[in-house]
Amino acid sequence: MLLMKNTLHIEYATKPHGRELAKPNEDRLLVDKERGIFIVLDGVTRPHGEYEAAPFESAAGEVGDIFLNQVYSYICDHLSDPSPKIILEDAVRIANEKINKYRKLKSIDEWSFFPSTLGIISILRGKTLHYLCVGDCIGVLIRYNSKIIFGRELTVKAVDICQATKSERYALYCNHPENHLSYTVFNGDDVVMDGVQYSLIDLHEGDILFLASDGIADYLKYEKAIDLITKSPESIIEGSGRYDAPPFANYADDKTLIKLHF
């Protein structure tokens, strides 16, 4: 029996960081139950200097909106195409080109990271979730009280096995050649498509699926499956503060979560 979208229960929430900074929430999410489209994005921007230097222009927020709107529009227009993989890849490629146009209007000297976004973009077709992941967002599948982590580990592994040297990976796969983080992000460069990872999950009745930004990653990874099953996205976001590194209390990062119960 096929999983029908009208049997799917969906909850979601987003919360900006709790620090006294000028930076707004740069996460983005999209839930379209009717079309089976679910997206979580995490914006990346770093100004030279401190966030407290207000007013803070959220270039990553702007990029996230550009990317999200373009990806969603493309997927909606091509849902009847036979290959979800091709739909997703073409959607993010075209959206990334739009980021490139945005970036050309900005001075790259304004940021130590180029304005960009990363995340998990997914389509539910029948019993199967097809998804692309880029960066350090995370997916968790709970089945029979056991957890399967996907998304973040898949992307990190892909970067780790890259044959390029460390410095080459910085230049190719991150926003900025001098930055210490070396995962792919959608920053307008064509090379980002080399780091886009596609996969699929065959779903069972009773499965619970989480798509989240990295601010909740440790909580999803280390908490017991039964606790995740029973908690709302808001409760999970609240509880994730215990994993935030000192000296920050809750919400050291923007936190966004979509919970899908099949």
Identify the residue ranges that each predicted region occupies.
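PP2C/PPM-type serine/threonine phosphatase catalytic domain
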Residues: M1-F262
